[in-house]
UniProtKB/Swiss-Prot annotation:
HAMAP family: ATP_synth_gamma_bact (MF_00815). Keywords: ATP synthesis, Cell membrane, CF(1), Hydrogen ion transport, Ion transport, Membrane, Transport. GO terms for molecular function: ATP binding; proton-transporting ATP synthase activity, rotational mechanism. It is a peripheral membrane protein. This is ATP synthase gamma chain. It is found in: Cell membrane. Belongs to the ATPase gamma chain family. GO terms for biological process: proton motive force-driven plasma membrane ATP synthesis. It comes from the Bacteria.
């Protein structure tokens, strides 16, 4: 009985230590997600303004550009996958990788070749374990979006979409990341980044035009200097970089939200285990006391 009580005490002590770790990680994720959400919300106006400007030029000046023209036949696609560097985030990375597998299967069924780029150690480990090929990977700070990382990813994507097909160029660029909707809802998403889909700027119901009525009412009166073509060529790389940065912000916020929920659930489970082991330890102690009393009474009666 004494040995059994010691076992339960050890389990209670180890579970209590793990509970402290879970609580600390939950608090860290909670504190960092506020900063990540602010970065995500701050990226919206800039990206939406660039979208409106690009649409304004393309629709009103009839500008044709290779990055806005869908080829007659898409033969090769670039797929960039955003996962996490670390675990302990629930099913965050596995959901993205599952969506990636579905996308790659769809591309194969359509006869398209896929060039895969991985962001996050989880994606790299997944492909390495299955001996799957990928073109390049980036790791580090997946839960902290940065403009430097967005610039690096954008340069690679712009290089591939602009390169000739015989040199490994691609016809379209697809992003697979987790869209942050709320603290409890995050959904894997596939976004076709390039070629751009240009819509009529006057029909765009984006956040910027909703906040600033003058932009919506007088959008058609904009003039672009020195000329619309040069402005359009300058806007496109900035637009792509803004969209990549937005995907990084969504992924970082989703990762932190998933980790916060996972650590809270782990802490709650640890609390239940501590209660269970405490109850079993008390039962074992009561059984030991009962046995000792029975032995004492039996010995007294024998005398």
């Amino acid at each position: 009985m004494g040995a059994q009580i010691r076992v339960y005490r050890q389990k209670i002590a180890s579970t209590s230590s793990m509970k402290k770790i879970f609580k600390a990680m939950e608090m860290i994720a909670t504190s960092r997600i506020n900063k990540s959400r602010q970065a995500l919300e701050g990226a919206y106006p800039y990206a939406n303004a660039l979208t409106r400007a690009a649409s304004q030029i393309a629709t009103q000046h009839n500008i044709s550009h290779p990055l806005t023209t869908v080829p007659d036949q898409v033969r090769r696609s670039a797929v960039m996958v955003f996962t996490s560097d670390r675990g302990l985030a629930g099913s965050y990375s596995s959901n993205v990788l599952k969506r990636t597998e579905e996308l790659l299967e769809l591309l194969r069924s359509q006869g398209k070749e896929a060039r895969v780029y991985l962001v996050g150690r989880k994606a790299k480990a997944y492909f390495d374990f299955r001996h799957r090929e990928y073109d390049e990977f980036w790791t580090g700070n997946t839960d902290n979006a940065s403009t430097e990382r967005a610039e690096e990813l954008t340069e690679r994507l712009m290089h591939d979409i602009s390169a000739p097909h015989e040199d490994g160029g691609v016809d379209e660029v697809l992003l697979v990341y987790t869209q942050f909707k709320s603290m409890v809802t995050q959904e894997p998403r596939v976004l076709r980044l390039l070629p751009l889909e240009i819509a009529d700027a006057n029909d765009l119901g984006d956040d910027v035009s909703e906040r600033f009525e003058d932009l919506r009412e007088h959008a058609s009166h904009f003039e672009f200097e020195p000329n619309p073509e040069e402005v359009f060529n300058e806007i496109l790389p900035r637009y792509v970089r803004a969209r990549v940065y937005s995907a990084l912000c969504h992924a970082a916020s989703s990762e932190l939200a998933s980790r916060q929920r996972a650590m809270k659930a782990a802490g709650d489970n640890a609390t239940e285990l501590i209660k269970k082991y405490t109850r079993l330890m008390n039962n074992a102690r009561q059984a030991e006391i009962t046995t000792e009393l029975t032995e004492i009474v039996s010995g007294a009666e024998a005398l």
